[in-house]
Amino acid sequence: GYNIPKSQHNIFFQGREYSPGILAFKEYKSVDKAVWEQSYFSNGSNGFVVTEHKRILESHASKNERAKFEKEMRMCKVCADNGYRINFLHGENRPKGQTYDITINGLKADLKCVSGGAGNIVKYAKKALVKQGGEAVVFELPSRSPEFYESLTKARRECGGRIFFYIEDEMILKELKV
């Protein structure tokens, strides 16, 4: 590779076509470091996670907040490994109706980890898409059980918005198309 001083990057790359990887990496590196932490970059897929410093501070409030942060960060990394650009947002002191967890490629979204059965999926989707101001919801599902797919389809029909999901063991993010 080239050993180009950072101050010369724009001059060197000017007029050259950027690969998607270079564009993603430039976006990842260009965030305001006073506001965002560069948390994760997936070299294989060019996805990334940047986290608001306020969100990291919130995770120190309690053991439960730390566990919630770690679960949500794990979900963000799965999205990044599937090629998505994730902004992981702080949760406290946000306007009512604007309490989604992340943006995924600029789309306001909430993260929902389903640990039991499929019974709460529609309720989770409604909360994310209506009460929390999301345009999408990302579900982590524990298995490929048909009941989960049926509930996701019902949620998509009833709630609108976009629904992404992945199976915990597979970690391949898919969007539900209805």
Predicted features by range, described:
Residues 95-98:
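Short acidic/glycine-enriched loop/turn segments that link adjacent beta-strands
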Residues 102, 107-115:
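Conserved catalytic cores of phosphodiester-cleaving nucleases, focusing on short active-site segments
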